[in-house]
Amino acid sequence: VGAIVGYKEMHSSLKTGVLQGYYSAPTFQSGKEPAFSIICDLPGGYENVMQFDTWVYQKGGIDFLREAQAKFGYYAVGAIFYGREVMPAKVAIRSMNDMKGKKVRAPEGIIAKLMTALGASTVSIPGSEVYSALDKGVIQATDWGTRSMNNQMGFYEVCKYSIEPGFHSMSLLEFTVSQKAWDKLPPDVQQIVEVATRAWSWAAVTRIMKEDAEAGVQLNKLGVEVISFPEEDYKKIREISRGLWEEWAAKSELSKRVVDSHIAWSKELGLLD
């Protein structure tokens, strides 16, 4: 990201031919199609990656993503997961109410809406700028990744608090290419690339799970305090999040179908009545 184009330009760069493909979060394109955000992340929704991955590959999620990208002449090869995010913070945020007035980095889309609903002000910046923004006090907390991902970015050098489990995000990333580039591949190679992308995802999930456990030792050495919200707060945040689902469903016809699909699968899982 940033080596050729900025993260907000990656999507349009496929059309101009600057790039043939990219690996990023669909939510960054929610201004072009709101469904990208609710495909990418479902705050207050799934409890683990397996539930989300099953929605993508067994309940039609990948078809929604491909439909959204087809509008631009692109093909979504597959989804890549990494795990449930936590939130590094420079100040102690011990409850939902403590989010009020805080400056938080959050991506465009439904996650930013959730932060706003909790009373925070949000800033959308690429990951490469988060450390500097934390260090200079531009933001006080950040949405970014799992414990080890945040630690590798150096965030816990300036953040002495970590909100865990994360209440806000367990997103998917996408590997998307231009349809023209995809069509040049023989069918057997296309199949190989799709299968390899699924393998890439689960290799990432298991590696990061191991690294998250190892990062706990490093956080202790850095003097980072792990904070968990009261369970009642997590329940309230889930209620707020689910209200946002309906708000997002009204943004486009595709968004409505995506939300309906999430709800149907969540009911099958017993996550919703």
Which role does the model predict for each range below?
Residues 1-52, 60-273:
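N-terminal secretory/targeting leader peptides
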